[in-house]
Design a protein with these regions (language model features):
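Short, hydrophobic beta-strand segments
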Residues: 56-62, 166-173
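ATP/Mg2+-dependent ligation/transfer catalytic cores
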Residues: 1-156, 178-184
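Acidic, glycine-rich loop-and-beta core segments that form the ion-binding/anion-interacting portion
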Residues: 165, 178-191
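Charge-rich, low-complexity amphipathic helices
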Residues: 101, 105, 165, 169-170
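Histidine-centered active-site/metal-ligand motif
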Residues: 158-159, 172
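Short, conserved phosphate-binding/catalytic loop or strand-edge motifs used
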Residues: 96, 160-168
């Protein structure tokens, strides 16, 4: 939509939802709106939705119509243009590490690993164990199904050293495309 907007302050929030101490220096005290422009190349299905649903990544623009300098996608595009000016094209293969946790509805409760198919929680390190990954086979299979439906180029999944800590590797490819895929993957894993 032409009138899609977000407040600039979203770009200076921390991972906890707080604002940086230099908020006003970065986006100004008025907290103006950015204009959002959808990138049709990022359109993907939402396979877990009960009704047919799509998702799309937007580029952020200032009120003057310029790419917003703080939007992470725009920062990456600037870096890629620097590479292009040198005649280079970066090829990347992201690795995303994350923890599986038991569903938790009370934010006061401690996060714990989920119960595996054996009926037990992990209690010790299971670095690179195939059996440890297999404990979570239902969620792993669903993850691969969701990734395939969204055309995410995921490859190898391994168990890392922490309790229920996983690492997924993406296939090598275009930096912007894979950054978008990682963004979608993170949302997918939260579902």
């Amino acid at each position: 939509k032409e009138d899609s907007r977000l407040p600039e302050s979203i770009l200076v929030q921390t991972v906890t939802g707080d604002y940086t101490k230099i908020h006003d220096q970065l986006v100004g005290p008025m907290d103006g709106d950015m204009m959002l422009q959808p990138d049709p190349d990022t359109m993907r299905l939402v396979p877990w939705a009960s009704d047919p649903t799509g998702q799309i990544i937007h580029d952020c623009y200032t009120r003057d119509g310029e790419l917003h300098p703080l939007a992470s996608r725009n920062v990456l595009k600037r870096v890629l243009r620097l590479y292009e000016a040198e005649g280079w094209k970066p090829v990347v293969a992201p690795e995303v590490e994350y923890y599986l946790i038991q569903k938790n509805v009370d934010p006061e409760d401690e996060l714990v690993p989920p119960i595996g198919r054996s009926g037990r929680r992990e209690a010790g390190r299971q670095s690179y164990s195939i059996d440890a990954v297999n404990e979570f086979e239902p969620i792993v299979e669903e993850m691969y199904d969701f990734c395939e439906a969204q055309e995410l180029d995921v490859d190898t999944l391994i168990h890392e050293s922490g309790l229920a800590q996983m690492e997924i590797n993406f296939l090598h490819g275009d930096a912007l495309n894979l950054a978008d895929q990682v963004f979608v993957f993170k949302r997918t894993m939260r579902e």
